[in-house]
C-alpha cells in the first residue's frame, strides 16, 4: 500500500512537468571548423520571444543573425539549415514594406576585438509554443545562423549577409 501511494504521488508530481510548455531553450553554436561559437538562449515571456546571444570565436565586425528553416547545421557551410524561416511567405528585411521573414531578426550583432559579442532581441513574431504557426521548435525545429557580413535589412532573400559562419540547432 505504501509503495502504491508513493508511486501515485510521484506520478502526480510528474504531470505538471509534462504539461508545462517549454519556455526556455539554450542552443550551442559551432563554427564551420567545429569551434565553440557561444550560445543563443530563447525564452518565451509574455507573448514575446527573447533571444539572448553570447557569441565567441567569431571574426571582428558586424554580423547578421537569422533563424533558418531546417534544424540542421552540417559544417563547413551550414547550407543544410536551408533558407530563412518563412512560414508566411514574405520577403526579406525589416525595411521591406511588404513585411519580413519570420527568421529576420531586428538587428545585427557586433563582434568586438576579443572576438566576442552579446545581443538581446525581443520579438513578437516568433514563438517556442509548438502550436504557434511561427514556432521555431515545431516540426523538428529550426536553426540559428550567424553570417559573415551584416544584414542590410532589405535585399531579398538574405540581406547581402554573406556566408554562414556559425550555426546552432533549435529543438527541445
Report each predicted region and the residues it spans.
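N-terminal leader/targeting pre-sequences
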Residues: 18-62, 67-172
Amino acid at each position: 500500500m505504501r509503495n502504491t501511494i508513493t508511486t501515485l504521488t510521484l506520478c502526480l508530481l510528474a504531470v505538471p512537468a509534462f504539461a508545462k510548455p517549454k519556455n526556455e531553450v539554450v542552443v550551442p553554436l559551432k563554427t564551420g571548423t567545429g569551434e565553440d561559437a557561444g550560445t543563443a538562449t530563447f525564452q518565451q515571456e509574455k507573448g514575446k520571444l527573447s533571444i539572448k546571444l553570447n557569441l565567441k570565436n567569431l571574426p571582428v565586425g558586424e554580423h547578421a543573425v537569422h533563424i533558418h528553416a531546417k534544424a540542421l547545421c552540417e559544417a563547413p557551410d551550414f547550407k543544410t539549415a536551408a533558407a530563412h524561416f518563412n512560414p508566411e511567405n514574405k520577403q526579406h528585411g525589416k525595411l521591406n514594406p511588404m513585411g519580413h521573414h519570420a527568421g529576420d531578426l531586428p538587428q545585427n550583432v557586433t563582434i568586438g576585438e576579443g572576438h566576442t559579442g552579446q545581443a538581446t532581441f525581443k520579438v513578437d513574431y516568433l514563438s517556442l509554443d509548438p502550436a504557434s504557426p511561427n514556432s521555431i521548435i515545431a516540426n523538428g525545429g529550426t536553426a540559428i545562423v550567424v553570417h559573415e557580413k551584416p544584414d542590410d535589412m532589405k535585399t531579398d532573400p538574405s540581406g547581402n549577409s554573406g556566408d554562414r559562419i556559425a550555426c546552432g540547432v533549435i529543438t527541445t
